[in-house]
Amino acid sequence: MTLIQDAELKPRMGSFKKRSSSKNLRYSMTKRRRSSKVMSVEIIEDVHDAEELKAVDAFRQSLILDELLPEKHDDYHMMLRFLKARKFDLEKTKQMWTEMLRWRKEFGADTVMEEFDFKEIDEVLKYYPQGHHGVDKEGRPVYIERLGLVDSTKLMQVTTMDRYVNYHVMEFERTFNVKFPACSIAAKKHIDQSTTILDVQGVGLKNFNKAARDLITRLQKVDGDNYPETLNRMFIINAGSGFRMLWNTVKSFLDPKTTAKIHVLGNKYQSKLLEIIDESELPEFLGGSCTCADNGGCMRSDKGPWKNPEIMKRVHNGDHKCSKGSQAENSGEKTIPEEDDSTTEPASEEEKASKEVEIVPAAHPAWNMPEAHKFSLSKKEVYAIQEACNNATTEGGRSPIFTGVMALVMGVVTMIKVTKNVPRKLTESTLYSSPVYCDDASMNKSAMQSEKMTVPAISGEDFMAIMKRMAELEQKVTVLSAQPTVMPPDKEEMLNAAISRSNVLEQELAATKKALDDSLGRQEELVAYIEKKKKKKKLFNYW
């Protein structure tokens, strides 16, 4: 009881682990919340992993001590995403968090939704078809990109790189502030990841010129540094045999956790997509039944729970905030008063092994956040993700585009050009030498037969050398393309003179041909006249 009294007398002091050590205190606080106004609304499922809970709490305490935790970002799931992005390394995560706060201040990410007006959105979507459309069967928003229809040259003519980056950040902020909360309410559980579909049919070097690569590089840095761990799974559809072969090579440069989320499919992808996404939520051109005829087509409709006025009303009321799985019970712990000389120390090894861990219930009390996005995460809902924390890695997401995989596609396209004439047997042996997700029966059969074969190793230096050479060749093509298409006046004059002379010669040839025809006609008449005279002469001699 002494510990409880101390916690009540000093609600803003002491570590969370000390205050959470009392089982009775936890249950009493839970009861008070049940009678609160927040609990009067529909509960959103929130189950926290005990190990992740401790890691986030330690990270949160460290941020509080260094005054690096703004009230808006005092969010359990946001901190967990950053921890996963740095493999739960506290110092590296803290550095990443600090850089994120600095970037948001310099870029103006907190006000971009109100201040930025992207008037050229219709033209941009015309040359870069992309957008959210519906949700999958687990409630996550579905993001679609048709990379084969991207025209990066015309895209950069209707907008600038800086404006597109602003639009990209604005869409990311809208996703976290509007779309994820709406999906959380609709699914009755925490949602902060997306399902992505990349259609690579028709993808070539024309889709990824230097301007496109520069744009992808900037977007990839923004996403990876400031919006990590937002990709749940990705389907790359209409991938040819060359693409699938080179995917085996390129994925050796990626983290296994990332590759586990990426499924490369051929042109028979419809059944697999329908396993994950309901037919009514999938566009007709991807095998679904939705056309969004009244909204300008599926790629422009932005269909989803965020279009429902009732759901959006609940979002504005804060109903998407999690109601279970708390670490900190006292909102006063978010900031440290100036008169508080005590420091919050992380739990010792003895505390970690003590009974305090055992009394943590499966669903913890509510994570105490202000008006930030309080989502709840259920471990069983994560699809194709390795659950061990040690396997976590840095990963950027893409709201209108997951740029890390776009960079991968760009590299694969380049390699396709280089290995265009590889013999078929060599191609197949490389393609099926290691397991890669594919729904084609023939592909799976060949993969099983070649399971014991190994992929030829390609060093990073060789890969970069190929990319550098292709960049040089593309630069030369760009220079040639930049040359004026209008012929110089002197050469044009020479060409016109040659054409004029050719016309004269053609006329002379026609006149000569006519004269020759006339001569042949007269010759035939003379021959006929001579033959006639000969016959008359013979007849005269006969008589």
From Swiss-Prot:
It is a peripheral membrane protein. It is found in: Golgi apparatus membrane; Cell membrane. Residues 490-526 form a coiled coil. Keywords: Cell membrane, Coiled coil, Golgi apparatus, Membrane, Protein transport, Transport. Gene3D superfamilies: CRAL-TRIO lipid binding domain, N-terminal domain of phosphatidylinositol transfer protein sec14p. Specifically expressed in flowers. GO terms for cellular component: Golgi membrane; plasma membrane. Its main location: Golgi. One of its GO terms (biological process) is protein transport. Required for transport of secretory proteins from the Golgi complex. Catalyzes the transfer of phosphatidylinositol and phosphatidylcholine between membranes in vitro. This is Phosphatidylinositol/phosphatidylcholine transfer protein SFH12. It comes from Arabidopsis thaliana (Mouse-ear cress). The gene is SFH12.
